[in-house]
UniProtKB/Swiss-Prot annotation:
GO terms for molecular function: 2 iron, 2 sulfur cluster binding; 4 iron, 4 sulfur cluster binding; biotin synthase activity; iron ion binding. The gene is bioB. Keywords: 2Fe-2S, 4Fe-4S, Biotin biosynthesis, Iron, Iron-sulfur, Metal-binding, S-adenosyl-L-methionine, Transferase. InterPro entries: Aldolase_TIM, BATS_dom, Biotin_synth/BioAB, Biotin_synthase, Elp3/MiaA/NifB-like_rSAM, rSAM. The lineage of its organism: Bacteria, Pseudomonadati, Pseudomonadota, Alphaproteobacteria, Hyphomicrobiales. This is Biotin synthase. Belongs to the radical SAM superfamily. Biotin synthase family.
């Protein structure tokens, strides 16, 4: 192990930093697997209960027809994926679905709309959704695309807890994935959200054709923000027929995926690291390694936007095998 990796992996306690170098982050990622896992688990235990996992549920409140050209996404209007576009859901139906998610064990409800950015006419029903979810005693999260300063403020005033806005991959590889917006556009919205006082949920996707360097740089970008994202979702690509990346995607080696989780935990020790999309393609053993590496959050339910998810019964069985219990930050199940 080189001296850079050794000094970081041997650190006595987790430190919040915003000055990670390329060399340092890469050295940690490529460290011997046992050393990497030991350090990630040590840091994880100093901040979180290793036997508790935070549970979220995600609902697509507006499907398809998106003006962006993200090469992996079935909801882009640029791709022929046979996914019909839908109108924005009625707030009452969203709130009803959120209550069912709460009763199933979710403490945070995430709502996604397939937009480049919301129009002003969309803000009133979106705000009603946020307020309705909050009234259930849950945390509310939304992903609506790029925001203006005023829209971020409106969401903050409504009580929105989290805003999801992934950077997907490294800045260097980004143009190979998305051409309708820039990497800087993503960072600009993150800044607006944080300035409004909303917590940030931001991560990326593995399996887009990126190199390990791109995974390291994606996490280094997030770890070097003035404030770490409070939640860092790590997705494994589920190739969708009709999307450009489905033709060129390469499967991610399970150990490389686990290394990415561990690096996120080490570089952002107080952030929730979410094992997000792609769990249907992961064995129980791979998911267990991810939890050991510092993942402490998942999405529950049968679907994530337009892709499959293991479902509550499989997750309960996995949790039982591993001795994991859902983390109940807010005591929401006192209402159930």
């Amino acid at each position: 192990m080189n001296s850079i990796a050794h000094s970081t992996l041997a650190a006595a306690s987790p430190t919040i930093r915003h000055d990670w170098t390329r060399e340092e982050a890469a050295a940690i990622y490529h460290a011997p697997f046992a050393d990497l896992m030991f350090r990630a688990q040590t840091i994880h235990r100093q901040t979180f209960d290793p036997n508790q996992v935070q549970c979220n549920q995600l609902l697509n409140v507006k499907t398809g027809g998106c003006a962006e050209d993200c090469g992996y996404c079935s909801q882009s209007a640029h791709h022929d994926t046979a996914l019909p576009a839908s109108k924005l859901m009625e707030p009452a139906k969203v709130i009803e679905a959120a209550k069912a998610a709460r009763d199933a064990g979710a403490t945070r409800y995430c709502m996604g709309a397939a937009w480049r950015s919301p129009k002003e006419r969309d803000m009133a029903p979106v705000i009603e959704m946020v307020k309705g979810v909050k009234a259930l005693g849950m945390e509310a999260c939304m992903t609506l695309g790029m925001l203006t300063d005023d829209q971020a403020k409106q969401l903050a005033d409504a009580g929105l807890d989290y805003y999801n806005h992934n950077i997907d991959t490294s800045e260097e590889f980004y143009a190979s994935v998305v051409k309708s917006r820039s990497f800087g556009d993503r960072l600009d919205t993150l800044e607006k959200v944080q300035d409004a006082g909303i917590k940030v949920c931001c991560g990326g996707i593995l399996g887009l054709g990126e190199k390990p360097t791109d995974r390291v740089e994606m996490l280094r970008t997030l770890a070097n923000l003035p404030q770490h994202p409070e939640s860092v979702p790590i997705n494994m690509l589920i190739p969708i027929e009709g999307t450009p990346i489905a033709k060129t995607a390469t499967p991610v080696d399970p150990f490389e995926f686990v290394r990415t989780i561990a690096l996120a935990r080490i570089m952002m020790p107080k952030s929730d690291v979410r094992l997000a999309a792609g769990r249907t393609a992961m064995s129980d053993e791979m998911q267990a390694l991810c939890f050991l590496a510092g993942a402490n959050s998942i999405f529950i339910g049968d679907t994530l936007l337009t892709t499959p998810n293991p479902g509550d019964s499989k997750d309960r069985a996995l949790f039982n095998r591993l001795g994991i219990t859902p983390r109940d930050d807010l005591g929401v199940h006192a209402h159930s």
